[in-house]
Amino acid sequence: MKNAEYGLTENLIFKEAVAFLKKKKTLTADEYKLLDEESRAKAFTVSGYTSMEVLQTFLNELSDACEQGKTKKDFMDNMNDFLLRNGYTGLNPFKADVIFRTNMQTAYNAGHYKSMTDPTTMKLRPYWKYTTAGDGQVRETHAMMEGRIYRADDPIWDIWYPPNGFRCRCSVVSMTKAQVERSGVEVSKSAPYDIDFSTGEIKYRFPDKGFSNNPAKSAWKPDLSGFDPA
């Protein structure tokens, strides 16, 4: 995207990310809430709107932004022009940012996921590392995942694959076995957790509410059978 907004430069626009958005089906928020998490990965909605024409216009503008490298401002200007012409209140900057960032990040990460789960790539780069933006705005639970390395087929990625909340800036990078060994980081085998020392209870940490799933995997369903990182 222009100005490398949210890390989505033109060099990182995957055709799979565009396809991920274009395959989505528009639903009202009430209809969306009735779906299971796997089905939600293939659906699209924006709270506050029930018109299919409006919802489809949102989706079309997001798809165009992903495909053509448009910015959040382009998206907001185009949507507000449409909304105001049709008797709706325009988007404020905060809502435009949430809609744009969440959908662009989800699409980008879906495209990235498909790339990383290519059989050849999986064989060469069989480990994945979770990374955050590394600043003071990173959520506590997300920060607990920073730098953790897991096998690419570890079930953790069914829960902790970004985005893991609204406006989440986390990402995942693939690694070779040699890179993992050089990093000196032990491969994790469990989700992050806290221990209540007064009771000894282990409390596993999860993504933000509504984000404990992997929409990329639900959309692409890679075949991980027979995968061996060794």
Predicted feature locations:
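Domain-core detector
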Residues: 1-165, 173-230
